């Protein structure tokens, strides 16, 4: 049989095998189990087992202990089963360490076990991480139902999405309950009690806390529940009770601060007389397409809100400079940046959190959310902050989708505490505006101090920009209770980033179109070449088998993506059938 008539050539078999391997890899990445801890045999509540390990930091590996803490799943139930949480203690390099620093990550829905900046405090302090229940431990409240609902939506902030989001939470909660999980034992207060259990097990008398964003809520509650064991507390991006949601007025205030910075910048002020007004008017009239590519307006508002939170370039492409640039370009009739944000939101947000843990912690503000949506919060989604709230709470429907924790209403308002506390906020932070801390928390802190950093955004901006100044600010407060912000220099807002969302959009769209067209033309050329001249020679065939599966595979996938983007907006871009057909058909 000649090469021109064989159904499965060697090259085709290899190509199909590669497709199969790629699909297996996609399946593994999607369904592979996470590394988890487990309850040791015979363990009882309060048991802690540790063994030497190395903890990775920005300055290399540090000697540490890693192990497992055993705690009740529901402390209100004497018959509760036990669960396990990971604990890591990074050893101080001093022979006479000060009070240990316990770290509290934000989120919610984010791990508490990763903190590359630990080396900034480990010279004379142990740095301790206690895994968040529902996320880091033996019970992980994954919600693939929520991920799927968000991936298949036609707009992340649409009504249809909100209903699917709430239904998915309900299905996820039912599944975990059927699996024996007591969801009443999860939430912010149980996580705080886990922190205290770790302190006791490690033998520390008093500890320091460094927290950020949603983690600051846990630091507050720890100070209210266990003040005698808390030495000092530093909160970055403060989130007092009632603020797991955003209102339009405060978001507008933050936009006004950006506008003031813009008016002082020649490039920015040359593009708009009033940045805040440009964003407000643009948000009310987001175009539905860039060229032939659809734009999901809710996605744009959601991505823009989170993009405005961080001023550091390290947060790109969700950084304030790139985000604001897309709005100014849209006002100049270039909506390419909006299209890129729309696609980016579809890709990033469905898998951004461990959704069950997210819901269990967010429900600490269930009453505030209920009041907000009862007052009409669903109706004002053109404001970026309101859009973010609508997404996070499913338009208020998540309240009915995830069950309440036993003690979720215990800390719905700020309580006074004498703990020495430093509140740190970025002037331009939209996620946790510093005026929240000034108005709601600081008056209840007789020994509290606040530092608002001009030109800074949310917590990533604090850690990434002027790190020496930030480290001095924290360590000086832990050492003496004094505020030392002397190393800070004026922080400029960059309105001219090296890479813009519009350039990324045009590059990405151009690559998809170019490779897609190349794949189609290549297939047409090869078919015509075989019809006219017969089979390729040995060298030509070898070259095609080696190089063209890459061209045809990528080009075919891009053609598939373009078809999905333009005609099937509810189909996720990581859909396995999409990958199999769009990559497999051109190669096979």
Residue ranges and their predicted role:
Residues 454-462:
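Histidine-bearing beta->alpha loop at or near hydrolase active sites
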Residues 143, 148-152, 219-282, 304, ...:
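A catalytic-pocket lid/entrance helix-loop region that shapes and gates access to the active site
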Residues 436, 461-479:
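Post-His helix in hydrolase/transferase enzymes
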Residues 9-15, 21, 26-35, 276-416, ...:
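Alpha/beta-hydrolase fold active-site neighborhood
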Residues 2-159, 275-279, 467, 471, ...:
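Catalytic-loop region of hydrolases
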Residues 417, 423-425, 429:
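Short beta-strand/loop motif that positions the catalytic acidic residue
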Residues 430-436:
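Conserved alpha/beta-hydrolase "acid-adjacent" motif
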Residues 177, 189-206:
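Conserved acidic catalytic loop of the alpha/beta-hydrolase fold
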